[in-house]
UniProtKB/Swiss-Prot annotation:
SUPFAM superfamilies: Variable surface antigen VlsE
Subcellular location, principal: membrane
Keyword hit for Lipoprotein: yes
Family named by the database record: Belongs to the variable large protein (Vlp) family. Alpha subfamily.
Originating species: Borrelia hermsii
CC per GO annotation: cell outer membrane
Membrane topology of this protein: Lipid-anchor
Segment forming the signal sequence: 1-26
The name this protein goes by in its record: Variable large protein 18
Function field: The Vlp and Vsp proteins are antigenically distinct proteins, only one vlp or vsp gene is transcriptionally active at any one time. Switching between these genes is a mechanism of host immune response evasion.
UniProt cross-references to InterPro entries, sorted A to Z: Borrelia_lipo (IPR000680)
Amino acid sequence: MRKRISAIINKLNISIMMMIVVLMIGCGQQAVEAGKDGARAATGGRSLSEVLMEVGKSAENAFYSFMALVSDTLGLRVTKDTKKNEVGGYFNSLGGKLGKASDELEEVAKKSEVEGAKDGPIAVAIRAAVDTAKTTLSTLKGHLESLKGIGDDKVVGWAENDQQGIKPADDGLNKFLNALQSIVKAATDAGVLAPKAGNTTLTVNGVDNKDGAKVLAIDKPGAAVGEKASLIVSAVSGEEILASIVASKEGDQALGAAADGTTTAMSFAKGGTKDNLSNANTPKAAAVAGGIALRSLVKDGKLASHNDNSEKAVQAAGVIAANKLLVSVEDLIKKTVKNVLEKAKEKIDKARAPKATGQQ
């Protein structure tokens, strides 16, 4: 797993460097304009406008190559052997790489200030674009790094044969909830659409799967329920799971009565008796799946399992839920970074574009 995480981080480093090349090219164009007297000699006899057009085209191609590559820089996938603290460590490392990207963007702004007047219109515009991008990257970095300690040395979806469930640690749940809520806010502030929860209940295609919620019991489930739990998780998307979690509140309590359509993912994660969890089929599947994902990823959390080795099916449901949630979070981060970098590039391109006479 460490080798896989290292490979992912290396790919992210390559992506960051490609983006910095793009931005450096933009600043480099500024320097070419400043040195008009020697421009033709420095460009092999071509006109300055020809050089600018060629460099601009290269910058555009490199930028979109970066955006294509960034789609492959994440992609941590949980297996039955993945430990909870490995997921937390991955998020922490990803946050560190966003911090490095922010530092590199700062160098772009400094370069523009050195090569031109610090208070000149081009340098000021580049500084503003970089600072805006850095603010979002810094926000994402902080919340991703806060997830470092949410797990422990148990496997994701931890369950044991014929054992009752255990609710996750409150501090871990609250930290995870706050981080996810803040990441979603940063995304929407950057122009990304917020995830939406669906209305699917625990009855799917005429099949009642309410017993699958018993994997979140704090007592023994009383029957093999792992497969029904997987059916619940499979009925919803990662986006719906994420939306159900961020709609929760820290103060949402464990179930002291029967679950219904208003029961949140946080309450499901904290659990209740098997009877309260499975009393009706009206709860939202996304909320149950969100509860399974939270309990599967956060320290101390344990899913309830029946005997006859049914813990394998229970853990499988936890792994599916965790992967769906992680994919949704990763997708949101990619979209956010993409929007932020595109906006920064647009502003920098506009700042270095030749001005018509009278607009200098």
